[in-house]
Amino acid sequence: MPINIPDDLPAYKVLTAENIFVMNQTRATTQRIRPLKILIVNIMPLKITTETQLLRLLSNTPLQLEVELIHMSTHDSKNVPKEHLLTFYKTFKDIKENSYDGMIITGAPVEQMPFEEVDYWNELSEIFEWAKTHVFSSFFICWASQAALHYYYDIDKYLLKHKLTGVYRHHTNQRKMRRKILRGFDYQFYAPHSRYTTVLKEDISSNPNLDILAESDDAGVYLVASKDGSQFFVTGHPEYDPDTLDKEYKRDKEKPGVIAELPKNYYLDDDPSQEIQVKWRSHAYLLFSNWLNYYVYQETPYDLSDLHERKK
């Protein structure tokens, strides 16, 4: 949260120059505060697991959030009880007249398919288009980041020779450290990945509306942001639980015809009989709290009905 200090205090200029969020008294006295409306579009098969992971990260701030969950009405979810969907989830049709301060779209295990062959692609495309005028800032995870880059910027994804799985070291783009999403980041940090496809750095770098903020020598581009902070694309899975990659590895070993790739830098000494090394938790909390605080809470209009005018 910001600190509120007098406008003319010497520390104000020093801290501002260090990229510390300081709120002057003039702004503090005119702030109006309300709960933030956050929409989670959950397209992961294990919806209960994913919603729990995301809510855990979102809860790690003093901000009050009102969270709504939706699923794809054009897709039959087989790994979640129907009662759970009926009780806790809505569909896009139910909420499309609403506006939201923030939206998160999860990953999905469909990256080996062309986008247009995914059975809910038309519905998801409608959400992408709707978000332009009804969501202040959007956060796309793994496959959703690739899908959103494709929809908004015509950036393609490419099939990897082998599944990328593990916990990889990343480095921040030090020329972009003044971007608020990177506040408090170490120059190097770890994050999980689990995917069969990738996007190319040169495709993103050539777009003047996008910034690459973090990447990995082994896993490629990780964190991309639109210049205006309305869109964030995360190619990995910072929300993963400690044992998620372990469960995926054991699941893949049971699938006939599937080569189960050992998650890299995950087990002690890369030995699956050894304990899991959790290296990404602090990064995940910081990433989500920075997004919520700097790009949602501090910037969104108090009256969400104003969002339509701002987004035109």
Swiss-Prot record:
UniProt superkingdom: Bacteria
Site (Important for acyl-CoA specificity): 111
Record: active site: 142, 237, 239
Catalytic activity: L-homoserine + acetyl-CoA = O-acetyl-L-homoserine + CoA
Site feature: Important for substrate specificity: 194
Record GO biological process: L-methionine biosynthetic process from homoserine via O-succinyl-L-homoserine and cystathionine
Database matches in SUPFAM superfamilies: Class I glutamine amidotransferase-like (SSF52317)
Role noted for this protein: Transfers an acetyl group from acetyl-CoA to L-homoserine, forming acetyl-L-homoserine.
Family matches, as HAMAP family: MetA_acyltransf (MF_00295)
Protein name, entry field: Homoserine O-acetyltransferase
Organism: Catenibacterium mitsuokai (strain DSM 15897 / JCM 10609 / CCUG 48821 A / CIP 106738 / RCA14-39)
Phylogenetic classification of the source organism: Bacteria, Bacillati, Bacillota, Erysipelotrichia, Erysipelotrichales
